[in-house]
Amino acid sequence: MQNDYPTTGAVMTAARPRGRPRAFDRDAALESATRLFWIKGFGATSISDLTEAMGIGSPSLYAAFGSKEALYAEALRHYGEKNAHFIWSAFQSAETARDAVTSLLMDSAAALTGCVADLPRGCMVTLSAVGGEGHAELGELVRRARAVTFERLEARLGQGVVDGEIATSADIHALARFVQAVQAGMSILARDGASRAELEDMVRVTMLGWDTRTQDVG
């Protein structure tokens, strides 16, 4: 779950409203589209699926959002803006890097299994397969969204080095990738039905190796 989504290219820009005022709630329609994309993915979601979920006709969809691609890009941003706080709030306020990583993963265990709100399981960004079927710009948008997790982790671990909590010899790049991979794996397991308790146990096992990975050996 992220909240930084760069926009690139024409497909990332929603159409500007023109003509008669809309006869539907655009925000509510976007929320419905986001949920549908989250559950089914971009490729498996058809325009008819979207119009049914959003309660509008296809002309209204195109007038309000421009295209399916532009709607998906906006849905990704909406997803991040609405849901990122579930996993990042405690991370950002944690006093130590260890506490930050633990909070990120534990809060992910709750959020990814729908335990903090009535949300679909898994992470919309992690589970997205868009980009390999002729939608290069959307693929780049998704990759950039995924990169946010790594960048935040690497920055926080770097601060841990500055604070003396993590050894200067520690490979914080590799450690950030490791934590990112753990969280991504949790998303897949959550989508497959793993419980919050199972994911929390996974986090505890992950953190058992913290000292080995962050301190000088010998």
Enumerate the predicted regions with their spans.
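Hydrophobic alpha-helical segments that form the core
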Residues: Q2-Y5, D107, R121-L127, T168-L189, ...
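N-terminal intrinsically disordered/low-complexity leader segments
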Residues: M1-F24, T214-G218
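Helix-turn-helix
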Residues: A28, L36-E74
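Short, basic, alpha-helical segments at the C-terminal edge of helix-turn-helix-like DNA-binding modules
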Residues: R77-K82
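Short hydrophobic clusters on alpha-helical segments that form packing/core surfaces
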Residues: A29-F37, S108, Q183
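Amphipathic C-terminal alpha-helical segment
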Residues: A111-C115, G131-G134, Q159, V179-A197, ...
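Amphipathic alpha-helical packing segments from all-alpha helical-bundle domains
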Residues: A84, D99-S103, H135-D163, A174, ...
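Hydrophobic alpha-helical connector segments
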Residues: E74, W88-R121, I172-V179
